[in-house]
């Protein structure tokens, strides 16, 4: 598209020279005018032929300068740019709207505009500015003796450029505000004709996005002091350090399993072996070491373990009834023996443990759970316990642990166990069973795949009624208690023991002080003895001197001695 502007050569020299209204066309062909045919004309705008003259579209008089056209990417002619760069700028083609009479005022504005174009497309050359008006264009009829001129009203940006003063910050802010997209774009192009003069309000085609406008306002440096909008300082969220509880969840779902009582929680598991009766002395020993206010112990019994306790309890009842019968023989009516059944007696009475020790059996798993929202017992026991000690451990339960079976309460707890807490196993079985290949394979599986499980080495003892001695008996219960204490952090120091240690240290210090005093006294006595000896020696020397003097005074005596 080309726009041709001409002025009448016959007009008065004093008449202000104005820019002709560009003639727009939607066709792809350009109207090329030869330089020779255009003699007498003042300027030709957007001509593709080099060496043409153009008038800067300003509101005041302007002088003609030599221009050079550039070609854009589409092959059509672009905007007319100045060959001579403005002072202080790099040699990059830039569109200028300068007036020589207002050159000093327009220098800073030109640099601001060039910087904004670079900000808009940093990786490409500055796009030429086109003053084309989209939509329908006004066609001016060619009448003779009629001055067809166009008085170009500046856009809001141009109007603000006129009032720009580089020494005032407010003017710079006003320009930046004017260059925003909502103010720089014009929605209509009104054209009015008065006295054969066409006045067109031509908008500029510079389009800026909100992001580019913000970058343009913030990236201008060294030219104009523009106060950019301060960025919001990101609020640093205070990270609250996470407090890791000792257990997974301190919520108490069962009053029999308090999670936040501040005690050590030891869970014993007993299986069907003759060593099951050692559970009572182990519990008693642990309570003596820590005290009831610092340790809480609960016990899980398998079905086989309860059989051992029930049989022993039944035998005791039978013996007591026999004694009653013997005592009642002297009476008229004999006493009837009472044989309790497992359902009639309390399990705590059968096991003969202190009443504060909680016992669990397989039936308790179903008694505690009635509906979907009720807690599951083996999960609650797993949450409650700090350590699990299975003593004694039979070959049956060992196989279940190695294979991952969970068909009772104890194996369900082991299967759902948290690996962060230890499990101690104390095997108790016949020597031939412990030395079998299957047992060795299962122990090897536990050792390799369950690092949180520790298997104690059994002891040698008489294993059966035949008197055979073999390896397979449960470790001595004192050693088991010792290993439990070491897993829990070692033996605690009581206040009494600390007081005794302090008293012993004080006694030792007093003894050392008394010994030092005695040694000092002995040294003083020795010094006194030495002083006495020295005095005696001095007296002897004085006596000898006196004798010598006497002999010197009486020479006759000396002669007699000779």
Curated annotation (Swiss-Prot):
<feature type="modified residue" description="Phosphoserine">
    <location>
        <position position="56"/>
    </location>
</feature>
<feature type="compositionally biased region" description="Polar residues">
    <location>
        <begin position="1"/>
        <end position="10"/>
    </location>
</feature>
<dbReference type="GO" id="GO:0007346">
    <property type="term" value="P:regulation of mitotic cell cycle"/>
</dbReference>
<feature type="modified residue" description="Phosphoserine">
    <location>
        <position position="54"/>
    </location>
</feature>
<keyword id="KW-0963">Cytoplasm</keyword>
<keyword id="KW-0597">Phosphoprotein</keyword>
<dbReference type="GO" id="GO:0042802">
    <property type="term" value="F:identical protein binding"/>
</dbReference>
<feature type="compositionally biased region" description="Polar residues">
    <location>
        <begin position="44"/>
        <end position="63"/>
    </location>
</feature>
<protein>
    <recommendedName>
        <fullName>Phosphopantothenoylcysteine decarboxylase subunit SIS2</fullName>
    </recommendedName>
</protein>
<keyword id="KW-0539">Nucleus</keyword>
<dbReference type="GO" id="GO:0000785">
    <property type="term" value="C:chromatin"/>
</dbReference>
<feature type="compositionally biased region" description="Basic and acidic residues">
    <location>
        <begin position="27"/>
        <end position="42"/>
    </location>
</feature>
<feature type="compositionally biased region" description="Low complexity">
    <location>
        <begin position="121"/>
        <end position="134"/>
    </location>
</feature>
<comment type="function">
    <text>Component of the phosphopantothenoylcysteine decarboxylase (PPCDC) involved in the coenzyme A synthesis. Acts as an inhibitory subunit of protein phosphatase PPZ1, which is involved in many cellular processes such as G1-S transition or salt tolerance. Also modulates the expression of the ENA1 ATPase.</text>
</comment>
<feature type="compositionally biased region" description="Polar residues">
    <location>
        <begin position="142"/>
        <end position="156"/>
    </location>
</feature>
<comment type="similarity">
    <text>Belongs to the HFCD (homooligomeric flavin containing Cys decarboxylase) superfamily.</text>
</comment>
<keyword id="KW-0650">Protein phosphatase inhibitor</keyword>
<feature type="region of interest" description="Disordered">
    <location>
        <begin position="97"/>
        <end position="165"/>
    </location>
</feature>
<dbReference type="GO" id="GO:0004865">
    <property type="term" value="F:protein serine/threonine phosphatase inhibitor activity"/>
</dbReference>
<dbReference type="InterPro" id="IPR036551">
    <property type="entry name" value="Flavin_trans-like"/>
</dbReference>
<dbReference type="GO" id="GO:0003824">
    <property type="term" value="F:catalytic activity"/>
</dbReference>
<feature type="compositionally biased region" description="Acidic residues">
    <location>
        <begin position="496"/>
        <end position="553"/>
    </location>
</feature>
<dbReference type="GO" id="GO:0010181">
    <property type="term" value="F:FMN binding"/>
</dbReference>
<feature type="modified residue" description="Phosphoserine">
    <location>
        <position position="47"/>
    </location>
</feature>
<keyword id="KW-0173">Coenzyme A biosynthesis</keyword>
<feature type="region of interest" description="Disordered">
    <location>
        <begin position="1"/>
        <end position="63"/>
    </location>
</feature>
<feature type="compositionally biased region" description="Polar residues">
    <location>
        <begin position="99"/>
        <end position="113"/>
    </location>
</feature>
<feature type="modified residue" description="Phosphoserine">
    <location>
        <position position="50"/>
    </location>
</feature>
<dbReference type="GO" id="GO:0009651">
    <property type="term" value="P:response to salt stress"/>
</dbReference>
<dbReference type="Pfam" id="PF02441">
    <property type="entry name" value="Flavoprotein"/>
</dbReference>
<dbReference type="GO" id="GO:0015937">
    <property type="term" value="P:coenzyme A biosynthetic process"/>
</dbReference>
<comment type="subunit">
    <text>Interacts with the C-terminal domain of PPZ1. Component of the phosphopantothenoylcysteine decarboxylase (PPCDC) complex, a heterotrimer composed of CAB3, SIS2 and VHS3.</text>
</comment>
<feature type="region of interest" description="Disordered">
    <location>
        <begin position="490"/>
        <end position="562"/>
    </location>
</feature>
<dbReference type="InterPro" id="IPR003382">
    <property type="entry name" value="Flavoprotein"/>
</dbReference>
<dbReference type="GO" id="GO:0005634">
    <property type="term" value="C:nucleus"/>
</dbReference>
<dbReference type="GO" id="GO:0071513">
    <property type="term" value="C:phosphopantothenoylcysteine decarboxylase complex"/>
</dbReference>
<feature type="modified residue" description="Phosphoserine">
    <location>
        <position position="155"/>
    </location>
</feature>
<dbReference type="GO" id="GO:1990143">
    <property type="term" value="C:CoA-synthesizing protein complex"/>
</dbReference>
């Amino acid at each position: 598209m080309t726009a041709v502007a001409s002025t009448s050569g016959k007009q008065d020299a004093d008449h202000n020279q104005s820019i002709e209204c560009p003639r727009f066309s939607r066709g792809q062909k350009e109207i090329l005018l030869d330089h020779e045919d255009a003699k007498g004309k003042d300027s030709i705008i957007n001509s593709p032929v080099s060496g043409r003259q153009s008038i800067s579209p300003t509101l005041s008089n302007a002088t003609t300068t030599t221009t050079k056209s550039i070609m854009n990417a589409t092959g059509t002619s672009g905007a007319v740019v100045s060959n001579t760069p403005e002072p202080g700028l790099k040699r990059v083609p830039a569109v200028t709207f300068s007036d020589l009479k207002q050159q000093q005022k327009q220098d800073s504005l030109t640099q601001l505009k060039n910087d904004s174009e670079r900000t808009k497309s940093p990786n490409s050359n500055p796009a030429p500015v086109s003053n084309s008006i989209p939509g329908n264009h006004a066609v001016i009829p060619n009448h003779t003796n009629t001055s067809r001129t166009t008085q170009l009203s500046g856009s809001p940006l141009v109007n603000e450029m006129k009032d720009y003063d580089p020494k005032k910050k407010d003017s710079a802010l006003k320009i930046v505000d004017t260059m925003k997209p909502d103010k720089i774009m014009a929605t209509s192009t009104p054209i009015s004709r008065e006295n054969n003069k066409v006045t067109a309000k031509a908008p500029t085609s510079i389009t800026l996005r909100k992001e580019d406008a913000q970058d343009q306002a913030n990236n201008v440096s060294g030219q104009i002091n523009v106060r950019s909008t301060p960025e919001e300082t990101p609020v640093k969220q205070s990270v609250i350090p996470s407090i890791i509880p000792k257990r997974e969840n301190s919520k108490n779902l069962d009053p029999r399993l308090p999670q936040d009582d501040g005690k050590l929680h030891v869970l014993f598991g007993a299986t069907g072996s003759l060593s099951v009766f050692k559970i009572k002395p182990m519990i008693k020993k642990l309570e003596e070491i820590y005290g009831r206010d610092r340790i809480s112990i609960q016990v899980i019994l398998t079905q086989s373990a309860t059989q051992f306790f029930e049989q022993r309890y039944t035998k005791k009842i039978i013996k007591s009834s026999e004694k009653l019968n013997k005592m009642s023989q002297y009476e008229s009516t004999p006493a009837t023996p009472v044989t309790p059944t497992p359902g009639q007696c309390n399990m705590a009475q059968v096991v003969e443990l202190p009443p504060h020790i909680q016992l669990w059996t397989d039936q308790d798993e179903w008694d505690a759970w009635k509906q979907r929202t009720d807690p599951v017992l083996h999960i609650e026991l797993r949450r409650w316990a700090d350590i699990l000690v299975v003593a004694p451990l039979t070959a049956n339960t060992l196989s279940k642990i190695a294979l991952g079976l969970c068909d009772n309460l104890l194996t369900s707890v082991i299967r759902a166990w948290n690996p962060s807490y230890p499990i101690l196993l104390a095997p108790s079985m016949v020597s031939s069973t412990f030395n079998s290949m299957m047992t060795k394979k299962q122990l090897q599986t536990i050792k390799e795949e369950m690092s949180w499980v520790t298997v104690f080495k059994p002891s040698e003892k008489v294993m059966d009624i035949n008197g055979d001695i073999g390896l397979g008996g449960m470790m001595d219960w004192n050693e088991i208690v010792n290993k439990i204490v070491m897993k829990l952090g070692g033996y605690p120091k009581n206040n009494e023991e600390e007081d005794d240690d302090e008293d012993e240290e004080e006694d030792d210090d007093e003894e050392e002080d008394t010994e030092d005093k005695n040694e000092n006294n002995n040294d003083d006595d020795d010094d006194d003895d030495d002083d006495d000896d020295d005095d005696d020696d001095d007296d002897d020397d004085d006596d000898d001197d006196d004798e010598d003097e006497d002999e010197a005074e009486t020479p006759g005596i000396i002669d007699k001695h000779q």
